[in-house]
Amino acid sequence: LFNGLVFMPFFLKDVKCGDIRYGRNYYDYQEGTLVFLAPGQVVGIVNNGEYFQPKGWALLFHPDLIRGTSLVREMKNYTFFSYESNEALHLSEQERKVILDCFHNIESELQHAIDKHSKTLIVNNIELFLNYCVRFYDRQFITRSHVNKDILTRFENLLNDYFQSEKPQIIGLPSVQYCADSLHLSPNYFGDLIKKETGNSAQEYIQAKLIGVA
C-alpha cells in the first residue's frame, strides 16, 4: 500500500501483475502503462488470491525537492495528475525506452556523491520526464481520435439537451465539472480533450454554444 500524503508518485508497470486500486476505482493498468497520482491519494494492489511478482518502476518525490525551482510554477500545466483511473498513459515501446532513460538518469544522479549540482540535475530530469509525458499524452489523444470524437458528439448532445430544457433558468450555465461528470470523465482530462479536438477550452465551447442558441 502506498500512501501519497506528501509524495508525488508515478508508476510504470513492466508486466501484468494485478490491478492497482485507487479509491473505489481500478486503473486501466496493463504492461507499459504509466500512472500518475496526486499527493494525498492512497493506492494499493488488488489481492485476488493469485500470486504475482510485481515488476516495474516507481518514482516518488517530496514536494520540498522542487520548492523554489521553476518546476513548481510548471506543475499546474501537468493536468494528468488529476485524471481518472481509466485515463492512464499507455506507452509505445519507443516511448517506454524514453521514460526509462529519464528514470535511469535520475537513479544515476541519486547514486552520485551529493554536490551543489545534485538538486538541479534531479529536478531537471523530473521536469524532462514530465514534458515527455505531455508529448506522449498528446500522441494518445491523437491515436484515440475516434474515441475523442465520440465524446465530443456526446458533449454536443449534452449541451443541446441542457439548453433545450429548463435547466438554464434553474441552474444557469453548465459548468465544466457538470459536463465532465455527465460524461464520466475527470474535469482535467475532459478539458484537455476538448482543447485538443476543437482548439477551444471546454468553457469557451460552452460559451459559444450559449451564444449559438441565444
Predicted regions and their residues:
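Short, intrinsically disordered, charge-balanced linker/junction segments flanking boundaries
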Residues: 1, 211-214
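Solvent-exposed, amphipathic alpha-helical segments
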Residues: 98-112, 154, 158-165, 213
